[in-house]
Regions:
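Alpha-helical transmembrane segments of multi-pass membrane proteins predominantly involved
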Residues: 1-477
């Protein structure tokens, strides 16, 4: 038991300790000391990152009766989740300043969400996975509802309902799989599947499990919630929502597609159809939208669909491509929401409200432009390299997937229109009488936007080292 704690769970225990500390302080400290909440959260996440060095990864380590595991794959995803959590905590300065009474509670919930996310990636049975998903889901629900406005409460309620339905579908799939194999452990299920012929009920259960998990990625037909949630949520929470849950869900989906869910054509074909439908819905919806948050919600859904299709086509090359794509995506996304955090949550997010902002905020808007063109997949950014590798992986997976590839390519070209729609108003109205205001920024916002933009360009120019690391991790999963 002690070996399990030090070989796998020390980062989890450290994070859990800081969660308890924040909850205790929320009851005993005055709201006037709200500034210390962010400091404690940042220290807790940093300590957890340091403790990752104690995690055993070679060979794979299984603990607590094989219910959790660690390897280089889980270590990378844990590191990415914790880094995103660190940046989200930095961006939450203005939010907790407006909600001083709930500052300690807010950061306790944020750390709980991170705790749930890293447990999802480490899970090696469906019971541990379910508890971790619910921990992440309920924490996300409270983070969405942190604002006092009507739209925030509506967004949280819609997320809760969608999450409940998707969890039900996931549980049905797990129950069918348990009925077939007699186990909830990934390793045992994988051994059973490889030694026996798969049946129709197995295929149905696998599709239900993947669909239940993919709903958190806003995949069709559970995609509509993302519109209302993004529209009614604070930008610092959106920086969390667009990164940490997605990393956690892709982390476990990729592992499940390797084992215990064998790579059957029926499962992959259904995922391919859902991915294409998601991309079609997201890109066509975004074209007619004028709210920047909604456009980014659709962008998030579309980008997730590209990665989901590639993740289902199991191979070392494809898996490494998905990992590289996710790293590039979360860096760009968190930078974009850091810029919107500079802009201010109390302002209108209609694209026309951004007119002329470049002329009052040259440097910040230039960095924001780099991040948006990265999301669009334009050259000299990591987004371009990531999408090239992603679509190459799909093309190499067989002729049957070429129509899906062509469809996704056409939709990606279509997506350029709404990315340009975000950028063009920024450079309008060059006269000095423009209504645009100079941002009142803090160091945390500048740091996140600057670092995100720099990494986006660096990975676009020289991605080789990161790609090699991703291939090494994919090979050793």
């Amino acid at each position: 038991m002690i070996n399990d704690i030090f070989n796998i769970l020390l980062p989890h225990f450290v994070l859990g300790g800081f969660i308890i500390l924040l909850l205790v302080l929320s009851m005993v400290l005055s709201p006037r000391l709200y500034r210390y909440a962010r400091i404690i959260a940042v220290v807790g996440i940093s300590a957890s990152v340091v403790c990752l060095s104690t995690v055993q990864t070679d060979p794979q380590y299984f603990g607590f009766r094989n219910s959790i595991m660690s390897d280089s794959y889980t270590l990378l995803f844990d590191f990415m989740i914790l880094c995103c959590g660190f940046l989200v905590a930095l961006l939450s300065k203005n939010l907790v300043k407006r909600h001083k009474r709930n500052a300690f509670t807010y950061f306790a919930i944020l750390l709980t969400a991170i705790f749930g996310a890293i447990n999802i990636v480490s899970a090696n049975d469906f019971l541990t996975l379910l508890v971790s998903i619910e921990l992440l889901g309920f924490s996300t629900y409270f983070l969405i509802s942190v604002s006092k406005g009507y739209h925030s409460k509506e967004a949280a309620f819609k997320y809760l309902i969608t999450s409940a339905v998707s969890t039900g579908i996931f549980l049905f799939g797990v129950s069918y799989l348990y009925g077939i194999t007699g186990s909830l452990n990934f390793t045992t299920i994988y051994e059973y599947i490889t030694q026996n012929e798969t049946s129709l009920i197995y295929t149905i259960s696998a599709i239900m499990i993947i669909l239940g998990l993919a709903s958190k990625l806003a995949v069709f037909p559970f995609a509509n919630w993302v519109i209302d949630v993004y529209k009614g949520t604070e930008t610092s929470v959106l920086a969390y929502l667009s990164t940490i849950p997605k990393l956690a869900m892709f982390g476990i989906i990729c592992r499940l597609m390797v084992f215990p869910l064998s790579n059957s054509f029926e499962i992959v074909f259904v995922i391919a159809v859902l991915s294409l439908l998601t991309a079609l819905w997201a890109n066509t919806y975004a074209i007619r939208e004028k709210n920047v948050k909604v456009i980014l919600a659709c962008s998030s859904s579309a980008n997730a669909s590209y990665a989901l299709l590639t993740a289902s086509l199991v191979s070392v090359y494809n898996l490494s491509t998905v990992i590289f794509y996710l790293i590039c995506y979360v860096i760009m996304n968190i930078g974009v929401f850091a810029y919107l955090n500079m802009y201010g949550d109390e302002k209108s997010f209609d694209i026309n409200a951004f007119k002329g902002i470049y002329h009052k905020n040259h440097g910040h808007t230039a960095l924001y432009t780099i991040l948006i063109i990265g999301l669009a997949g334009i050259p000299i950014t990591s987004g371009f390299i990531a999408k090239i590798y992603l679509f190459t992986a799909i093309a190499n997976s067989g002729l049957v997937f070429v129509p899906f590839l062509l469809g996704l390519l056409l939709l990606m070209v279509l997506a350029l229109f709404y990315y340009l729609k975000i950028l063009m108003p920024l450079f309008y109205e060059c006269d000095k009488n423009t209504d645009a205001e100079k941002f009142n920024t803090n160091f945390s916002q500048k740091f996140v936007v600057g670092v995100s933009a720099i990494i986006t360009v660096l990975l676009g120019v020289c991605p080789e080292m990161l790609i090699e690391l991703c291939r090494f991790i994919a090979y050793n999963i």
